[in-house]
UniProtKB/Swiss-Prot annotation:
This is Dehydratase asqC. InterPro entries: AttH-like_dom_sf, AttH_dom, Fungal_Dehydratase/Hydratase. It is an enzyme of class 4 (lyase). Glycans are attached at N51, N103, N131, N143, N215, N264, N281.
Amino acid sequence: MRPAILAAFSTLPAAAKATYPFAPETFDGSYKDIGLPTIYDLSATQSTNYNGSWATGSWITSVSGGQYFVVSHYVNDGIHDVYRSSILDLSSLKYRYFFQAGNGSYTASPPSHLKAGVGKGNGFEGISNDNYTTMRVQSSHPNVTFDLTYHATTKPLINGGAGVVMLGASESKQWSLPACWTNGFLIVGDEQIPIDPKRSLTWYDRQWGTGGLTNWTWYGLHIPKTGHVLSIWTGDTDADRAAPITPVRFATVRNAYGAQTVCNITWIPDLSHIFHSDSTNKSYPLAWTVEIPSYDAIIKVKSRTENQLNTGSHGSEPEAYNGFVTFAGQFQGTETEGFGIVEIVYL
């Protein structure tokens, strides 16, 4: 018999003081010998030979104790050229976002450092010589301003186990640094807010390839109690856009020691709990049940607040729902809870 789904983080009232257990990992080993059969060198994928997507979700605690969820995402895949950023105050649940399309650029030919973004001060910069063990991310719009530096103090998650998966009819490559040490500041209103690095972390995600999905929901989840992190993919291809395929439903699970497992999942969105956007005329589920049989896991994932949609002028650039989520339930047969990010995109 399945245990009752716990509520924990998910039932905090809107005005509650946020007290999420944000903390970076403290891995200090070599990424050149991670003991996994990756098909590429992580540093090489930050070069100009690879376009695609650079993204971060940062779970921030300020020096004064306030907590925030910060998103930065640059896409340059030959079709889309867009930068998105947002800040969600986890106490007031006030959401701010910035969207800029066009005139983006990225450079990283050795020995130069990665620079990927749109306009001045909006995007990603490699600080370390390998372009990924220390990085900087910025947003300079008055509505969303931050300057973060993060360090790869976390064991990587290599999506699919080797770094390549079939998303629809085509290959996609993806790797992540899920719990980086993070420093810097945000500006909220007129206040500059310094970050407490010991109580903050960043998930850096790098992805490229053609892919074949016309809609998807992706999660990056943390289980603080056990040190597990999960990259969960779900998606479909519309029959009028490509040949019908089996829907994408899988998770890559990385444990506290860095071991990776690729698992089938069952994914059920709660269509009675949705956010409908008048600007896009699309509906976004806000709650989901995810089952991972090989981990004796069933979790209920919930968006912390309804509107976390980042949208532009509704031209050729797709909008994205990049939301802070919490979850609770069962993992490895024991009660668990955690937090993470969800990305929902409809092309």
